[in-house]
From Swiss-Prot:
Keywords: Acetylation, Aminoacyl-tRNA synthetase, ATP-binding, Cytoplasm, Ligase, Metal-binding, Nucleotide-binding, Protein biosynthesis, Zinc. Catalyzes the attachment of isoleucine to tRNA(Ile). As IleRS can inadvertently accommodate and process structurally similar amino acids such as valine, to avoid such errors it has two additional distinct tRNA(Ile)-dependent editing activities. One activity is designated as 'pretransfer' editing and involves the hydrolysis of activated Val-AMP. The other activity is designated 'posttransfer' editing and involves deacylation of mischarged Val-tRNA(Ile). One of its GO terms (molecular function) is isoleucine-tRNA ligase activity. Its cofactor is Zn(2+). GO terms for biological process: isoleucyl-tRNA aminoacylation. InterPro entries: aa-tRNA-synth_I_CS, aa-tRNA-synth_Ia, Anticodon_Ile_BEm, Ile-tRNA-ligase, Ile-tRNA-ligase_type1, Ile-tRNA_ligase, M/V/L/I-tRNA-synth_anticd-bd, Rossmann-like_a/b/a_fold. It is found in: Cytoplasm. This is Isoleucine--tRNA ligase. Zn(2+) binds at residues 901, 904, 921, 924. The gene is ileS. It comes from Escherichia coli O127:H6 (strain E2348/69 / EPEC). One of its GO terms (cellular component) is cytosol. ATP binds at residue 605. It comes from the Bacteria.
Length: 938
């Protein structure tokens, strides 16, 4: 028997079947670094229209987690897809380097500043620590396959950036947005510092809930208001609170002007409550026998005075819009030094902003004899005992509620009035302008707009000062007596900024005021406060984007971070940019959800359900992690687990196998000389290129919309359905058995070449390592890297006017599917082995029959059978299978006649008819020794 294997065009490629990504990717990274791939891309894109994605800086502390990976991979997908779309899209990664977490780490190792080290030495240690953290995180980000200017990132602790942060504050001061005030701010007693909104987390806490009676100073005036004369016992206004420790700072009782308030007679006294809450309060305090003596509107009680239960003063009733009927008594204990609503209404009524609590959370001397020096959270019991002793406590119980806590210490925080510097939301219209700017930004997903609008509309002034060691100094001088800013503040700040640009923030603390103030130095003091770290990152649109040469003065097109950044970086950036420039710093804002485990639970080390990106990369490779990110809908929570990553790896194998099939069948193909013109190609091959064209349109649209899971779904559908289960199956016969240089084979290779050129580019933003690997095996002259080019423009398709147009092949796909069902049943019944052992007769109604007949003898190649004939639908025998999909089709199957050709495996009756090749069929003889078979359609 002759060996005809050598006459076949068997697929051959060096592209490995197994990805072995964990082993191969580091080598690719080394090549990217050695070649300066990022620099090559920048050179290739020079002069193109720009797209700037400004990196929100992660905090330089600790190893990267799965959330970091999601963020950086999403950014990288966008940057790479924009590059392929013809943009110059530089990516400058950044890090947030100042602030409390770094201070705490350094304190743990070296002690607090001033103990073993001077403040200057402490700052140097902080800088050193941050630098090591940056290096560690940078290695992991690079390992993810993220391309960027990793050699020249921006750090908020770079001297120039620190200087520009000071300049940003100067601009805000110049525009009139800064003011100083003793306002209640979130205060952590462990940090001994004010906290930003974004540094506050909420946890359940058990607190005492108390109802307290404030006796009226003028009992007769109240009787007159309610129109009663006979009241048994004193009259009191009752407040409800869950923070008894704030009662020493009480300066008023807030009531709602339009609520009805009832005077209620109970045993031995009368109490004033919101009428709608009388029943619930009576139940709470355990009173069943009570009488409502009269009612008045809250406005009638304004400025009547009530005695503080244990302090030596009385307080007014005032009117406030913040009073609700959700809980309590309808009368709100008001301490302007301990709450933002209280502060606002206190300003309106000229109340004292009392703050009897020190920075460590203990009462200051002179507050109250039994409270001085006591921690506020331990004081609740003392205050409750005092109220009981004074006869003012109507009820006490425990309640669990959501309470603000420090994000770092996880301990409860307090509102505490301290002298701080604020960016005002309203004194120069910052709130109104910010709300206007929000409307001009595209928010992705679109619910982000309502979220940040609500936050801006309701947020208090931004406290930007901190009492910390490691941070950018505010660089202000205030008058010793008046505490007013120096009249030349902006000029002085620029002088400080110049020094910081040379020597870093230490230049401020080393500065002798006389150096820049001269004789005025005796009248002014340096403000010791540092800036909130959210000011550092929030000003990077100015301190980084405006000054980096690669951005060429263009504002950022996009900010992309987790959904928690509406109140964090998106907010601080919007505030600062609007205060400085009157406009938003971004055109688009994209947010992604948090990562959760496979059961939708938040990731936690204590539960043991965290997924380490380092582990995933070391076991599966970065491309699997990237594919998981891209295939997950980032607009909600992003579930990840070993099982989910295994599914991503399965999808990866499908894509890799498709790419490998293309490459293996391009063996011996030189596009420069072997390409077949579209009009001369086999129709099915043109259809396949048209499928790629349609897929590319969908994929590019999805990339443009940042809809990456749709990119992956469309890519998978193309590989699995259009190619894998139809086209690639059909062409194997022609590809392997036709003459090597025949139009039939070269047409097929031309299609595969066009498809591969498109596919490798679709993959590149997501499966960057694999795309780079595929690129190296593609035939023809090309640039060294796929990332320097643009989307493939060589695709074409069938015209609708052609008889065998896309609709024709769509119907053929359905016919093929119906034939497959019949073959599978025959295999199950042991009537045939493989499909080539079968011959089918298609009984079709006239319109479908005409389409099938048009393919002539090539119909069998589409159906992967050794024989295929078309007959009239009405002639179908009883055992023909009626199609459920195509009503005008019945399929009958029989065993193919003739012998099996050992070369093409088809069963035909002309095997052995040619003496010189007595073992093979006539078609194979033509392909081996003759002119080769001709194919028009398939």
């Amino acid at each position: 028997m002759s060996d005809y294997k050598s006459t076949l065009n068997l697929p051959e490629t060096g592209f490995p079947m197994r990805g072995d990504l964990a082993k191969r990717e580091p080598g690719m990274l080394a090549r990217w670094t050695d070649d300066d791939l990022y620099g090559i891309i920048r050179a290739a894109k020079k002069g193109k229209k720009t797209f700037i994605l400004h990196d929100g800086p992660p905090y330089a502390n600790g190893s990267i987690h799965i959330g970091h990976s999601v963020n950086k991979i999403l950014k990288d997908i966008i940057i790479k897809s924009k590059g392929l779309s013809g943009y110059d899209s530089p990516y400058v990664p950044g890090w947030d380097c100042h602030g409390l977490p770094i201070e705490l780490k350094v304190e743990q190792e070296y002690g607090k500043p001033g103990e073993k080290f001077t403040a200057a030495e402490f700052r140097a240690k902080c800088r050193e620590y941050a630098a090591t953290q940056v290096d560690g995180q940078r290695k992991d980000f690079i390992r993810l396959g993220v391309l960027g200017d990793w050699s020249h990132p921006y750090l908020t602790m770079d001297f120039k950036t620190e200087a520009n942060i000071i300049r940003a504050l100067g601009k805000i001061i110049g525009n009139g947005h800064l003011h100083k005030g003793a306002k209640p701010v979130h205060w952590c007693v462990d940090c001994r510092s004010a906290l930003a909104e974004a540094e506050v987390e909420y946890y359940d806490k058990t607190s005492p809930s108390i109802d307290v009676a404030f006796q009226a100073v003028d009992q007769d005036a109240l009787k007159t208001k309610f129109g009663v004369s006979n009241v048994n016992g004193p009259i009191s206004l009752v407040i409800w609170t869950t923070t008894p420790w704030t009662l020493p700072a009480n300066r008023a009782i807030s009531i709602a002007p339009d609520f009805d308030y009832a005077l209620v007679q109970i045993d031995g006294q009368a109490v004033i409550l919101a009428k709608d809450l009388v029943e619930s309060v009576m139940q709470r305090i355990g009173v069943s026998d009570y009488t409502i003596l009269g009612t008045v509107k809250g406005a009638e009680l304004e400025l009547l005075r009530f005695t503080h239960p244990f302090m030596d003063f009385d307080v007014p009733a005032i009117l406030g819009d913040h009073v609700t009927l959700d809980a309590g008594t309808g009368a709100v204990h008001t301490a302007p030094g301990h709450g933002p609503d209280d502060y606002v209404i206190g300003q309106k009524y000229g109340l004292e902003t009392a703050n009897p609590v020190g920075p460590d959370g203990t009462y200051l001397p002179g507050t109250y004899p039994t409270l001085d020096g006591v921690n506020v959270f331990k004081a609740n019991d003392i205050v409750i005992a005092l109220l009981q002793e004074k006869g003012a406590l109507l009820h006490v119980e425990k309640m669990q509620h959501s309470y603000p806590c420090c994000w770092r210490h996880k301990t409860p925080i307090i509102f505490r009035a301290t002298p701080q510097w604020f960016v005002s939301m309203d004194q120069k219209g910052l709130r109104a302008q910010s709300l206007k700017e929000i409307k001009g930004v595209q928010w992705i997903p679109d619910w982000g707009q309502a979220r940040i609008e609500s936050m801006v509309a309701n947020r208090p002034d931004w406290c930007i000062s901190r009492q910390r060691t490691w941070g950018v100094p505010m660089s202000l001088f205030v008058h010793k007596d008046t505490e007013e800013l120096h009249p030349r503040t902006l000029e002085l700040m620029e002088e400080v900024a110049k020094r910081v640009e040379v020597d870093g923030i230490q230049a401020w603390w080393d500065l002798d005021a006389k150096e820049i103030l001269g004789d005025e130095a005796d009248q002014y003091v340096k403000v010791p406060d540092t800036l909130d770290v959210w000011f550092d990152s929030g000003s990077t649109h100015s301190s980084v984007v405006d000054v980096r040469p690669e951005f060429a003065g263009h504002a950022a097109d996009m900010y992309l971070e987790g959904s928690d950044q509406h109140r964090g970086w998106f907010m601080s950036s919007l505030m600062i940019s609007t205060a400085m420039k009157g406009k938003a710093p971004y055109r688009q804002v994209l947010t992604h959800g948090f990562t959760v485990d496979g059961q939708g639970r938040k990731m936690s080390k204590s539960i043991g359900n965290t997924v380490s990106p380092q582990d995933v990369m070391n076991k599966l490779g970065a491309d699997i992690l990237r594919l998981w990110v891209a295939s997950t809908d980032y607009t909600g929570e992003m579930a990840v687990s070993d099982e989910i990553l295994k599914r991503a790896a399965d999808s990866y194998r499908r894509i890799r196998n498709t790419a490998r099939f293309l490459l293996a069948n391009l063996n011996g193909f030189d596009p420069a000389k072997d390409m077949v013109k579209p009009e001369e190609m086999v129709v099915l091959d043109r259809w396949a290129v048209g499928c790629a064209k349609a897929a590319q349109e969908d994929i590019l649209k999805a990339y443009e919309a940042y809809d990456f899971h749709e990119v992956v779904q469309r890519l998978m559908r193309f590989c699995s359905v259009e190619m894998g289960s139809f086209y690639l199956d059909i062409i194997k016969d022609r590809q392997y058995t036709a003459k090597a240089d025949s139009v039939a084979r070269r047409s097929c290779q031309t299609a595969l070449y066009h498809i591969a050129e498109a596919l490798v580019r679709w993959m590149a933003p997501i499966l960057s390592f694999t795309a780079d690997e595929v690129w190296g095996y593609l035939p023809g002259e090309r640039e060294k890297y796929v990332f320097t080019g643009e989307w493939y423009e060589g695709l074409f398709g069938l015209a609708d006017s052609e008889a065998m147009n896309d609709a024709f092949w769509d119907e053929l796909l359905k016919v093929r599917g119906e034939v497959n069902k019949v073959i599978e049943q025959a295999r199950a019944d042991k009537k045939v082995g493989g499909s080539l052992e079968a011959a089918v007769t298609l009984y079709a109604e006239p319109v479908l029959a005409a389409k099938l007949t048009a393919l002539g003898d090539e119909l069998r190649f589409v159906l992967l059978t050794s024989g295929a004939t078309v007959a009239d639908y009405n002639d179908a025998p009883a055992d023909a299978q009626q199609s459920e999909v195509l009503k005008g089709l019945k399929v009958a199957l029989s065993k193919a006649e003739g012998e099996k050709c050992p070369r093409c495996w088809h069963y035909t009756q002309d095997v052995g008819k040619v003496a010189e090749h007595a073992e093979i069929c006539g078609r194979c003889v033509s392909n081996v020794a003759g002119d080769g078979e001709k194919r028009k359609f398939a």
